[in-house]
Amino acid sequence: MTEELQYVYVTTTGWKSGNPHTIEIWFVAYDGRYYIVSEHRERSHWVQNIRRNPAIAFRVGDRHFQGRGRVVDPTAEPELAAAVCALMDAKYDWSDGLIVELHPESEIAGGG
């Protein structure tokens, strides 16, 4: 089902405000996790939020998750970075940016 879906909705906690911040962004699924790419790399507020507090909530279709986000280091994990870039290129014809992994730790029954 995730092959058909175009967007994931990711909620981070604002590192300055402490308020929830939700984005809509392209994604790919790989090996039980979800991956998104920040076009603006470290300048994206949501990346800064994840760097400071990796606890996230996210929605893929009608599935809601609590989990953790982390930036993928392409130097330390070249195979993972290459796989994610290939999937993004195949799905969206674009993969230029900072890769962030969304690791679902629990699914929220009933969507929230």
What positions do the PLM features span?
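Short, structured beta-strand-loop surface elements
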Residues: R41-G111
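Short beta-strand segments
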Residues: L5-E39, I56
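Disordered, polybasic Ser/Thr-rich segments at the N-terminal boundary of pleckstrin homology
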Residues: M1-T2
